[in-house]
Amino acid sequence: MIFSRSARSIFPLLPPYGAHDPQGGRAVPLQPDDITPYMGLRARLSQIWMNRWTILLLLVLVRVLIAIASLNTNMDSARREALSACTSVESMGSAMASMPHYSARGINELTASGVETAVSALKTMLTLVVSGVEELIVFFIKMMYQTYLCLITMAVRGTVDVGVGLLKDASDFLNSTIKSIGEGISDATQTFEDGLNKFVDGINIVGSVFGGDEVPDLDLSSFIEDLENAQLPSSIDDGLDKLNDSVPTFDEVSEFVENIIRTPFDEVKKLINESMGTFTFDRDTLPVPAKKQLSFCKGSDGIDSFFNNVSDIAETAKKVFIAVLVIAAVLVCFPMAWQEIRRWRAQKERSQLVRKEAHDPLDVVYIVSRPYSAAAGIKAASRFSNSRRQILVRWVIAYATSPSALFVLSLAIAGLFACLCQYLLLRAVEEAVPELSAEVGAFADKVVASLDNTSAEWALSANSAIGDINTELNDKVFGWVNSTTTGVNDTLNTFVDKTTGVLNDTFGGTLLYDPLKDVFDCLIGLKIAGIQRGLTWVHDNAHIDFPELSNDTFSRGAAESLSDDNSSESFLSDAGASTSNKITEVVFRVTSAIESGIATEALISGAILLIWFLNLLFGLIRALSLFRSHDRNRGDGGPGPAANLDPNDGFSDVPLTAIPNPHTTAHSAADSQSRSQPVPEYEPPSRNFASAGPPAAVTAQTTYEDEKLGFAGQRRNALKVSVIDARASSYPEFGDEKR
């Protein structure tokens, strides 16, 4: 491949070596400290501090410092807004804490009217209950003893009627029977009497003969007449008739019991009307809490400490970033210096390739000027056996690591690193936000605590007044209820005693007493015992107890709003607010703005990085498209065989000690004679090297691939360094260093 350019286009007006030298331009060996037209190692090392990564790190530091300054400005503004919002919250909290003062009057009126209504309803209910119980007890007692009276009447009169009938039948039977017996005895005794009298008359006759007394005659007629006239007395059933007529009516007992029972009930109703008829709750006994003025913004350690903490974080981050990035910028100079030393040595070694005719001159320039990119390409290309593909791989790496591409890549990396530094700063600030949220929660807790204290004090006084009402009603009204139940129990006992006395007086000593006593116990005694147990229960449980007011009457709603899952329900939040309160919303707005800025910068840096990847993709697409094509032979339209070419063909020998003559041609023989003095020049090779790769013709119709990719990968000794000693100074060199 021929590269032909005029000497002026390559070295425009170069000053000759030694033009300033008193030696007259004579070529002399140069020492390491001599002046050269190119930068030596010392000169390169003197510019290490201006290397790409140091400058980028310093730019990142500048961006971070700008971000910190912007953060401080935004936080100062947020502090003012937060204090303003805190004042609003303080006013709201004071209003909330003073709500018991305004609502207590209404609640007191509601409580008093509720008690009055309850007492009025209680009065009506008690009057109805007392009247109902009174009538029920009277009705029950009347029903019991009237039932018992019916049973007694039925039993006694039935028994008396049966007894009287039996006695009448027995009397009639006995009267008729005795008369018949008397008549029969009269007839029998008359015959006996007549015979006996005859016998006696005979004896009297004999006795008179002998001078004795006469035997009296037997006369039974008077006795027989008495027997015939004998009958049961008519008064035999008078006792039963008297018993039948003496069955008790219990009218006296009924009247007595009814009067005793109604007396306590009438007294209770009278007391109920007197004590509860015009009941009025004393409103003055219910307290009215005083107004509250809360203060938690002035000198608030929470808000001030948060923003001071954020300022401290920003200041600390500023110092850390300055220290770390400056140290990193300084430390990166050391590997860059070492890299520059290695680059210098590699350039010196590879500069020998310029003297070798087997190399593509542009490839040699690329290898010498960009040793690391070239080395990376050579290493990557070593994985392929095909020389064409080796060239394409080297070309892709050279395309992706060109100065423009590396500038884009380094700019993208620096931008992303700056975003990372800003993100770390933002995370440090966001970690401090919960402290502010906790402090705002403490504000709400202070309001709720104030409401709790006020509500508890008010409830204590109000409950005391309600307790006094309970005591008064229990003593005045239900005390008489207790007395009434005791009196009714005593009345029932008196009723039982009176009834038992009547039964004892009426049927005592008779066969009916025990059966009637058992019937009384069964019908009335057991029922009265049950009534007495019920009255005893009423006596033990008759009292009123109005419910007390809760201690959290005024604070329950505020406390529930804080514990609610929906933070927008908090009394410190506006309706529809997305944050828990106004104060933290200010900080969230600042952090959101910073986060949005970081995201924007990250997108920009990502777009720049994408440009580099697109550039790499273009190179890969180009290389892959050439991977599939093959070199053609001459018979297939390919180039002809390579000729033995002079490596200097297409180049002009440019004298380094004199200004070249623009009128001479590149191949003029007089050019070498016009030189004032001989200068060191590269010796042409003693023999030509045959091409080891695919043939390439040096013609005007050179292919596009040859012009763009070169021949470095197509020659056997393309990457070999000549073992021939390069031009060296006669003076010792210290580390091959050049200034």
From Swiss-Prot:
Glycans are attached at residues 175, 244, 273, 309, 453, 482, 489, 504, 551, 566. Residues 634-697 are annotated as: Disordered. Its main location: membrane. Residues 74-135, 342-394, 622-739 are cytoplasmic. Keywords: Cell membrane, Conjugation, Glycoprotein, Membrane, Transmembrane, Transmembrane helix. InterPro entries: PRM1. It is found in: Cell membrane. The keyword Signal does not apply. The chain crosses the membrane at residues 53-73, 136-156, 321-341, 395-417, 601-621. Residues 1-52, 157-320, 418-600 are extracellular. The keyword Endoplasmic reticulum does not apply. One of its GO terms (cellular component) is plasma membrane. GO terms for biological process: plasma membrane fusion involved in cytogamy. Residues 662-677 have a biased composition (Polar residues). PANTHER family: PLASMA MEMBRANE FUSION PROTEIN PRM1. Belongs to the PRM1 family. This is Plasma membrane fusion protein prm1. It comes from Emericella nidulans (strain FGSC A4 / ATCC 38163 / CBS 112.46 / NRRL 194 / M139) (Aspergillus nidulans).
